[in-house]
Amino acid sequence: MKDDNRSGGSARGRNRLVLRTPASWWGNAWREALPSGNGIVGAAVYGAVSSETVLINHGELWYGGKPGELPDVSHTLPEVRRMMDQGQYREASAHLAETLGRLGYESVRETPLPLADLNIRRPVDSGFRRYRRTLDMESGEVSVRWEEGSDAYERALFVSRKDDVIVCELRGSRKGSVAAELELKPHQKGEAASPGIPKCVEESAAVSTAVLAADGYIRYAAKNDDGLDFGAVLRVIPQGGTMTAGRDKIAVSGADSALLLIKVFVKGERERDWLRLERELAAIGQAYAELMQRHAAVHGPLFRSAAIRLQDESEADRSNEEWLLEAYEGELPPGLAETMWAYGRYLFISGTREDGLPIPLYGLWCGDYKAVWSHLMANENVQMMYWHTDVGGLSALALPMFRYYEERMEQFRDNARKLFGCRGIFIPAGTTPGNATPFQVVPVILNWTGAAGWLARHFYDYYLFTGDESFLRERALPFMREAALFYEDFFVVAGDGKLLSYPSVSPENTPGNFMPENHTFGGVGHPMPSAINATLDFAIAKELLTQLIEGSRIAGVYAGEIGRWEEMLARIPEYQINEDGAVKEWMHPDFQDRYRHRHISHIYPVFPAHEITREKDAALFVAFAEAVRRRLVIGIGDQTAWSFAHLANIYARMEEGELALECLSLLARSCLLNNFYTVHNDWRQMGISLNYRRAPVQMDANLGWVSAVQEMLLYVSPGTVKLLPSLPQAWNAGEARGLRLCTGSIAFAWNRDQGRLVAELKAERKTELVLRLPAWAGEWTWEAAGEAEAQAAGPHRAVIRMAPGSRLTIAAGSA
């Protein structure tokens, strides 16, 4: 069988994952499958030779949830505050949650529901040789190849972003060598310890088959717990050979190849949707290459919109297994750092689309029933999954996240009113597509009020990077105003004229003086999280109010409210420093810092915000750096994949390239599966992260990695751009293109050993900024195309002014 590169992507080398083994996680092989997706439909290929499984999912298929009817318990807020004023912190922390419990409030979260498995069984006459499974990220094609005797075989699959169909082709090198038995059925779980097929699915699943002329069809459907059907139709198109239909299977034998086309439906009625999908499948072309070309024309430009090169060409053909073995030696290979950056972008592009839902923590490839931590969690995780989008040129794919929260605003207003008696919105940290009421009825979640404000920065960043004033006026500012209204009612003015925030939670942490000895707490993960004046609360509020004032003036709205917001800003207390020289996590004397924790949200003013930099406030910057250092040194065994990714982003922002790289290295050694999915924690008792046997897949770290690499190479704020601010020694040479500035784009290449750096800036809107070059770069010159100029502003600094449509090239060293 010749390699005709029908994928339309990269034939070999960069932007490919290569594995020498099939998915092998016992009972949960989906965890190591290779993913393909079109933003709403996902397919995960296990890679078995004899009995292949392809897990099929749809982003809108969730089950098991039930929104609660929230009672009005706003009277508890003054009660909680009285308790806290009297030092009864434990009682105060639990009061809201206990009150809801006494009133019988219950809200149940949904989880993703796997749609179906495609099983492909084939006879094996001799043992396999030269096995490979690959993912071409440029095209989204997953392929499995092997040899048996003198024959070679391949299965190739992608999910079309153009035609909304799963396309799979079975190939053999010898005419008539393709034989397979095909079946659609409920997703199978092999691990008895985890939940199996839901009763509603098991009792309602139905399969029918038919061979009509040269085509075969398999129809599959089952019922969700809401009584609505979901399912799929498979069309089988063999080239040559024979095709027969059994009760629930279709068999192909003696074929040269076989094309499989699958369309899925959710929230429907099986008979009607089967007929509709059969008509759609009958109208689709029958050539794999043609369908791939149509899909690649949409997927490819998204994936190739940005590129980073850190590795030599000689490294590009390594397998995932080889990359991981090298990472275990302790040094993160530049090629693995690059590949993980590309893979995170691939997962994001494949896991969401503009008219869909935000990407969830499992992407579109969850194979668990009742999956752990599968909801959208906005006390860091959702935000981490979108940190990369603007600089990475994928701002348009943040729109589903904005729409998701906007569509639930009335429930968020109800939450704020009934829980706290406040105007504006209260967004629970955890939500699902069908449930925006609080379903984590515990103090650490209920008493945290920062989700709306933290999410608001993403709305404003979208405006900053697109210049879309309609979005600013009609969507960003109204959302931000609702978040600010909540703070207006929730914050209290203390006797010294400063604001108080209480109860106040620093996400998922408990002050050190409220922790049991030895940090063990009888299974209660958060013994006393509710404090006064969490630093994060005021960091979020300060950024929100600053941007709301700025944006309102730009858009010419809310003029009568700006004075109020300015007064609130003036009343926000200053950040405080503890006896260790670290920024305090709680700005109140009754609450001591606790460094042994995975969350590090109080570093928000440094990252993701731009409030504190070394240039603006060197002393405070050092105090933030000390708080970060103590987290990593003291609490390495308390970290997770996403916390290592968060730390990498923070160290990159602090221009500590070696430490940022070490965080990525720790992540790779502890929380990376062989298909490069990130999991929450290590499962092998290796001492680097938390220990949790199930180690759930959590793709926040995959996407946090993308942001960290970008931050290491490029710092972007509205008025400042820093080239290579956090470049580790291992990345001595490389290039980047397609990364975004607030008003345009930038491409650059460097070789530190030679002191060379070349950067080209393109302005799409009026651009005025300070550009900082790395200290190792030599003397620089500039050349403009169009109305643009660069003026020296101190060592390694230039003031850049560019008109729309102009280009400016900066060259340093002997470039």
Summary of predicted features, one role per range:
Residues 172, 761-765:
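Asparagine-centered strand-capping/turn motif at beta-strand->loop junctions
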Residues 334-338, 473-478, 642-645:
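Alpha-helical scaffolds flanking conserved acidic
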